[in-house]
Amino acid sequence: MKKIASFIATAILCASCVFPINMNGIKIGDGKTVKCKGPVTTNTFDLTGFDAITVNGYADMELFQGDQFQVIVKANEDVFQYLDYKVEDGVLVMETKEHVNIKAETYEMTITLPTLKNLTVNGACDADMKTGYSSGENLSVVVNGAGDFELSGIKVPSFNITLNGAGDIEADGLDVENLAVAINGAGDIDLSGKALKASFTVSGAGNIDASGLECENVSTQKSGFASIKLNK
């Protein structure tokens, strides 16, 4: 789960985080914890027609841009009976039945889609998009809880990142017109690439490192123990 455990520990201290969290397992909601065993298997879900993703609970996923939709889950066999994945109004909703908290040695997803407009996490999420993403549509990432994101080669008109809680987001090789980044709580966001206009807001104990970002029009606002580092 990469760095997510340390961020969950920090999130417990953040008033903005309202999720009951158990460090001994993936416990994000108020449902019971189920221990899932069995051989590791891979299943493909027949889900298409979405341009947004909402995670309610926990996810460890890799994201790819492609012409065809694909939702693949690799996990211990017992995990699949608890998954409740569906598409609602163009949004891929990823959650568990009765909001149970899954504890498993293996539980990871691979998602391919043509266009991603919004990624919202209500809980905790490890997410990688390292092979690049280009679109004429705006992109928004919202984390309510804890997150560890590695994003590379994002090329969109407008890119918004909002971190409410704790986490670590790295966005490298950005090529955007407008960039808006906000941290409410504790978190680190590292940015590199270029933007025509950028705004950075941090409330709490967060850090934004934009020293690798080329941008002449930048506005900043911070409070608490926040820090914002710009390219000089």
Question: Where is each model-derived feature located?
Answer:
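Intrinsically disordered, low-complexity terminal regions
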Residues: 1-232
